[in-house]
Swiss-Prot record:
Location within or outside the cell: Host membrane
Organism: Human cytomegalovirus (strain Merlin) (HHV-5)
Transmembrane portions of the chain: 171-191
Family per record: Belongs to the HHV-5 UL120 protein family.
Protein known as: Membrane protein UL120
Residues listed as glycosylation sites in the UniProt record: 47, 50, 56, 85, 96, 114, 123, 138
Signal peptide start and end residues: 1-25
Membrane topology of the entry: Single-pass membrane protein
GO cellular component: host cell membrane; membrane
Residues in compartment: Cytoplasmic: 192-201
Extracellular side: 26-170
Keyword Glycoprotein: yes
Chain's gene name: UL120
Presence of keyword Disulfide bond: no
Length: 201
């Protein structure tokens, strides 16, 4: 029994290392593990009082898509809106999903300047983007037009810690699930072979 226990431990450790690399490869190749793509835009009009946020999230070949947006200000964090779509048979049916989320916030002039907006999507892994709201007041005399601003990749900042932790946690859950499955198979095989040998005697 002692020998079997040592063997099991070694195999489990090796399997963990193997699944670590295999899981990374799988997340790159399996269709619904591609993280959702997030595109964002906003309008900050009427002397920086009305902030309208646009968030488009797209997931390809996925069993579901859950999207949402939030804003972080110096003294509060506010979840703004969310949306979920999924196929009737998530195990076998994969679809392409696009969510177009829009939300308008109204406050005192300058309330949302320098606030950070995060839009995200999840189809089994996270795709998220965060940008900083900038003033859109046009100082030119007589020019009152405010245009939509499409957020470029160069304007993205680091996502809130929640999303970084969630990405790591989801990845580790996949790895640990694989390890538990491998250990279960090894145990089952050992028990079966030991029982078979005992009956054979």
């Amino acid at each position: 029994m002692y020998r079997a226990g040592v063997t099991l431990l070694v195999v489990a450790v090796v399997s963990f290392g193997r699944w670590d690399s295999v899981t990374v490869a799988t997340t790159i190749r399996v269709g619904w593990w591609y993280e959702p793509q997030v595109k964002m835009a906003y309008i900050y009009e009427h002397n920086d009082t009305n902030l309208t946020i646009f968030c488009n999230t797209t997931a390809y070949d996925s069993p579901f898509l859950a999207s949402g947006m939030m804003i972080v200000l110096p003294h509060r964090t506010q979840f703004l809106t969310r949306k979920v779509n999924y196929s009737e048979d998530m195990e076998n049916i994969k679809q392409n999903y696009t969510h177009q989320l829009t939300h308008m916030l109204t406050g005192e002039p300058g309330t949302y300047v320098n606030g950070s907006v995060t839009c995200w999507g999840s189809n089994g892994t996270f795709g998220a983007g965060t940008f900083i709201v900038r003033s859109m007041v046009n100082k030119t005399a007589g020019n009152t037009n405010t245009f939509i601003h499409f957020v470029e990749d160069s304007e993205l900042v680091e996502n809130p810690a929640y999303f970084r932790r969630s990405d790591h946690r989801a990845f580790m859950i996949v790895i640990l699930t694989q390890v538990v499955f491998v250990v279960f198979i090894i145990n089952a095989s050992f028990i079966w072979s030991w029982t078979f040998r005992r009956h054979k005697r």
